Amino acid sequence: MSKQSTGAASAYAACVPHVPFMNIQARDRNAGFWNAYEAQAARLRRFDPELVFVFGADHYEGQHLKSMPTFMIGHAAHAIDDWGGFPGRLDVPMDIARACSEFIVEAEFDVSISYAMVVDHGFSGILHHMLGAVDAKPVVPIFVNALSHPRPKFKRCRQLGDAIGRFAAGLGKRVAFLGSGGLSHDTSDIFPQVFETQNEALRDFLIYGGAKGALTPERWRTELNAGLVEVNKLQEQKTPGVGAAKPEWDEMFLRRLTSEGVGAFDAWDDAEILRTAGNGAGEVREWIAALAAATAAGASRITVEYYEAGSCIGVAAAVVHAQ
């Protein structure tokens, strides 16, 4: 039986990676990670949230460079059937999403909104694994650009999360905040910056999403998936240099996150992170926003439940939670 709302807000947060490889490899290859992940999912289900805010990234499936938002709040959304993702329509409570957008604008954030938001595994993976399905709970999806230059400042991501948390605290509900992505990894060979690639077809797709040029969304996905299958073989064999994490960077981030809080990264320089931890490490913006939101909504201690640099999923495997 679901818990009855007491009218008093309470908050929960979890942050985990969303890399597709974790969904196609046998779970016993990464048993420690999955044990920690499933324990966190069980904890979330016991919390039984009445509302979920999920902070996720996109991999040129829903957002393209013809008009790339820095932040976006989905008022309606569906997840595509991409590699490592789980398709379906998200149960977005439009009235709450709209009220959240209004609150955020009053907080002086000029966010984008979408009534037809398309999300990929960057959102659907965490919803599926944490809650059982992408539509298991009412959810407001928050896109944070972590892939395309220029990315938002870490301070701004924290401030956005803080504002969303203050909005959520006023709802009188049990609210979960999920951060999807990270930690250290590099995907620049797969997702280059548009001004760095000489491949005209790829450049057109990054900008137009298949509306112009030789790459259709179907062909893009087919070719991307084929490449990822080959990379996955190398990762499962633990080929040196393939999918290598940066444990020194990860451990520094997690140590500061738990000891200093989300404000510790306000002055971080994006170029330095790209150099030392890879362009995928920028997805910790989603973690910072989610944990800032949870903190503003009443969560306290941030805890690292699991970390492993040597997994074969292509990123450092970590599970972080706050409540």
What name fits each language-model region?
Residues 60-64, 184-189, 194-195:
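Short catalytic/ligand-binding loop motif for oxyanion handling, primarily in non-cytosolic enzymes
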Residues 18-20, 55-59:
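Short glycine-rich, polar/acidic loop-and-turn segments at beta strand-coil junctions
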Residues 1-49, 65-159, 170, 192-323:
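Flexible, D/E/H-enriched segments
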Residues 161-166:
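Internal active-site segments that recognize and position negatively charged phosphoryl groups
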